[in-house]
Amino acid sequence: MVALKSFRHSGPSFADLVPYAGLVDNGVILLKDGSLMAGWYFSGPDSESSTDAERNDVSRQINAILSRLGSGWMIQVEAVRVPTADYPKESDCHFPDLVTRAIDAERRAHFQKERGHFESRHALILTWRPPEPRRSGLTRYIYSDTASRSATYADKALESFSTSIREVEQYLANVVSIRRMMTRETSERGCFRVARYDELFQFIRFCVTGQNHPVRLPEIPMYLDWLVTAELQHGLTPLIENRFLGVVAIDGLPAESWPGILNALDLMPLTYRWSSRFVFLDAEEARANLERTRKKWQQKVRPFFDQLFQTQSRSLDQDAMMMVAETEDAIAEASSQLRAYGYYTPVIVLFEEDQARLQEKCEAVRRLIQAEGFGARIETLNATDAFLSSLPGVSYANIREPLINTRNLADLIPLNSVWSGSAVAPCPFYPPASPPLMQVASGSTPFRLNLHVDDVGHTLIFGPTGSGKSTLLSLIAAQFRRYSGAQIFAFDKGGSMLSLTLGIDGDHYQIGGDATEGGDGKALSFCPLADLTTDGDRAFAAEWIEMLVALQGVTITPDYRNAISRQVGLMAESRGRSLSDFVSGVQMREIKDALHHYTVDGPMGQLLDAEEDGLALGSFQCFEIEELMNMGERNLVPVLTYLFRRIEKRLTGAPSLIILDEAWLMLGHPVFRDKIREWLKVLRKANCAVVLATQSISDAERSGIIDVLKESCPTKICLPNGAAREPGTREFYERIGFNERQIEIVATAIPKRDYYVVSPEGRRLFDMALGPVALSFVGASGKEDLKRIRALHSEHGAAWPLQWLQQRGIAHADTLFPAD
């Protein structure tokens, strides 16, 4: 016979070390000891932009929630740092030109570098062990209804657990953004079969192996310990699935804590899982434990022989006296039930295929923990127990003896969330799953910048001169081209968008200057009365003529208004549509004289009195208005009013962006102020976002529509401003909702590198992460650069970007712009 005993007998396996038994309800797992477990994903507030009072308030609320729990409960807060390389795919972007495509390709390569960027995800696990049946048997006699008496122990335990976690979830939802880990079902084989996947079980599998993937549950979801198992090799440096496992334990707590004391751990540029386990004790159990500690220290206050012979040597241990006082304070807190006590076990788990690299990472984590004032050690003999203690639902392994209270726990657990932005464009008018506007950097954590909050994309950008405002606007315009059918209308000052506009073969108009030419080389002139097709067109034309007359100091009377409307109606049926045709046809001398300034015989005739309109609006239009702004109100207002009208007619639902650089020039004029107010209220329906950029904070405040700007522009981007803390400027930031900490961030940020974005979704200080290709087109705004760009454009035409990049020393320029 074959000796089969050695094959039939097996020792304990890894499945015997984990407690998971079965799935008993949606998102609820039963453990082998009868405990029930549920989990949530959550995102806490951004403490980097919060004041000390706000951080303390969050910690106070978390303590109030956790102090309700007692013996039998355990909470585990997990912070997972994972690599991210989810830059929008090239196939999801629709850049119509080589320049913006090259800029985005450069940014994609930057953000997809190996081990380049990481982001944090947070989870919370609650475990409850019901009291034994013999201890809860009396409760069935308290209730008189038949259902309560006939319900089984398991049903009552599950109902009690569901009620408790629902209350905890409701309380936590007031502090953090939270989502329950649920069981989901999908149809297979033509809806003949239903497959079940549980998010909590998937997270457990991730904690065990470090690999995140869905796990299909069996028809009867029991014996889950065998599904979650992995190959474990025990040792000083254990191996799981052929990957080395490192565990760093936090074992020395400082004398005091404050909210977010370990937030630096949540920003490290490496992959790890930080587990914080807390096993709750009832007030009675906590007092009993604390009383034993008090007696131990009390015995050390007086020397042994003084206690033995009842003498008074007056040699007292002052340290022991302090410990007794602190322990008595802790007993009082436990008795008040304002704070709960329990056993706290924090560990950081790392996986790595190379043992030497794992050791380096563990030492880096240990150094960071020690720098924060904590003790830390890299586990060796205790590594397996420490790893087991980090797994969801494991309450028996690696119990750390000293008690801490829930107020300290609220300071220690990872609640801070670095806002990473939406992974898709939040605007519902864009195609589903459209990529975000652009990805920028902030340390080792990337940030997806979107101007939109739901369907509102209006944005306010403000900061002092020379802090990088024009570069940001140009990059926003370049990255906005990723959306199919996108159209951009920019009002520029100083030629900061000239290089980008010419590079993408857009239309650049220098209105009112000596070189009044369009992008096609033809002289730019307007024929505002060219389109009189609809009643709306004729109404605008009549109103526009009335405005010209009023700007010349003539009071509009009903007779004048009727004469203007009558002449506009006649012109709608004739071929001549120029302003001179209108003047020759209108019968009132006062109107003729008032409009003389705008005809070919006057100084503005070159712009406003053309037979045909020279403005052909394309998908990217840039209007240089610096010269126009210096021509006075009588000349400025008619031109911009007409341009605004032409742009409004182009807004048919395609993704659109209107950029107003140096918007303080427009905020100071009643006509444009009212137009901006109107745009902010109605253009969102046309899928158009308005970006207002200004360097004059005082002008924005005096504009009279600062409240409209604050309410209608949910996204605000602040440029570094060293004067933000000074009186006068501080009040403006406070008026738009900034707190003391946010003002401090703006004041200490680095000009031309840092930008601070604030929206209802979150707050973040970011860096645009510009490469040399992007800088060549969005950052070239100096006079010498613009002069050289104009010369190259004149000499090489559409091929000038290649010459420009080669002159700037970019070696791979020929690969970005291949010859036809």
UniProtKB/Swiss-Prot annotation:
Binding site for ATP: G463, P464, T465, G466, S467, G468, K469, S470
CDD domains per UniProt: TrwB_TraG_TraD_VirD4
GO terms, molecular function: ATP binding; ATP hydrolysis activity
Signal peptide limits: 1-15
UniProt-listed Pfam families: CagE_TrbE_VirB
Family affiliation: Belongs to the TrbE/VirB4 family.
Name the record gives this protein: Conjugal transfer protein TrbE
Organism, as annotated: Rhizobium radiobacter (Agrobacterium tumefaciens)
